[in-house]
UniProtKB/Swiss-Prot annotation:
Source organism, top-level taxon: Eukaryota
Region (G3 motif): 218-227
Organism (species): Homo sapiens
Residues where Mg(2+) binds: 62, 203
Family: Belongs to the G-alpha family. G(12) subfamily.
Family annotation (Pfam families): G-alpha (PF00503)
Topology in the lipid bilayer: Lipid-anchor
Protein name: Guanine nucleotide-binding protein subunit alpha-13
Reported impact of residue 14 to S: Fails to localize to plasma membranes and failed to activate Rho-dependent serum response factor-mediated transcription and actin stress fiber formation
The protein's role, per its UniProt record: Guanine nucleotide-binding proteins (G proteins) are involved as modulators or transducers in various transmembrane signaling systems. Activates effector molecule RhoA by binding and activating RhoGEFs (ARHGEF1/p115RhoGEF, ARHGEF11/PDZ-RhoGEF and ARHGEF12/LARG). GNA13-dependent Rho signaling subsequently regulates transcription factor AP-1 (activating protein-1). Promotes tumor cell invasion and metastasis by activating RhoA/ROCK signaling pathway. Inhibits CDH1-mediated cell adhesion in a process independent from Rho activation.
Binding-site residues for GTP, renumbered to this chain: 58-63, 173, 197-200, 291-294, 349
Amino acid sequence: MADFLPSRSVLSVCFPGCLLTSGEAEQQRKSKEIDKCLSREKTYVKRLVKILLLGAGESGKSTFLKQMRIIHGQDFDQRAREEFRPTIYSNVIKGMRVLVDAREKLHIPWGDNSNQQHGDKMMSFDTRAPMAAQGMVETRVFLQYLPAIRALWADSGIQNAYDRRREFQLGESVKYFLDNLDKLGEPDYIPSQQDILLARRPTKGIHEYDFEIKNVPFKMVDVGGQRSERKRWFECFDSVTSILFLVSSSEFDQVLMEDRLTNRLTESLNIFETIVNNRVFSNVSIILFLNKTDLLEEKVQIVSIKDYFLEFEGDPHCLRDVQKFLVECFRNKRRDQQQKPLYHHFTTAINTENIRLVFRDVKDTILHDNLKQLMLQ
């Protein structure tokens, strides 16, 4: 009977895997699982839409990223909102210190001389304390300074200094928070969605946010825009689908915080010229966001862009004329005018509905261009 039994070698040929040891079977299972994972990852990477947010410091990149979380993510729960409270308190104290210092340097008299003591109190704030150095202020500390801040903001001297803010560096959201001191001073204060959008903390390093729209994976990458942070940009250039280049359109009359000499719009134009003419991005759709339209609309009423850009033609107090000029300034930075079209949008990053509508159009543009690239591969 034994003569009719097939040998082990015949069995292994006829039924591979039947005689595998438990260790070999486990190894084979793991190998198949790894192959599946690699296949899924390859499919994911091929479908992934990687969007790079670029632009000079304070152009609105981080605010735009917050909006993506609000619109396409899980929004900010109570715990996440509370984490912004120390940053907001820091924004207020830093902003008031800037105004007190500016009032003195601009030789603006106090409306009420007794506010000098409040000004001295603000300037004595220890900015080198551990939390303050990180751009955060505890509730307990903020409440100690709140009466002084409230008195100073009501002083005509500080108000006059604020009116001349283009002559020094002041955060754009300072007025919003100073106008809401009562809310900020409540013991159970929890930042609102608008508070979070206006809270300012400089971006250090690289921040990514992943989300899906109709089963299409998106990865949005925000890199610091200050000069010291731009060397990190090159770390993010791999496999980029699209670049959203943000510009603070209202800053045509302001200078950089870094050197206090270079015009901010000129700086943005120079950065854009480097990006748009880089061969690495020859197949990447570049979309220009002329941001802070709300502030630009206010500014053109009182400041003439022609005083800063002599080549401007048109009505300097007409928003549409100024916006048309800004678009042309950026278009003219492209050396190859025959390359892919330059898309542009006028945005207000703190306005959720505006960003929702704009990004809907941007998403369609990106996906359309991405599909064309995939078909050419």
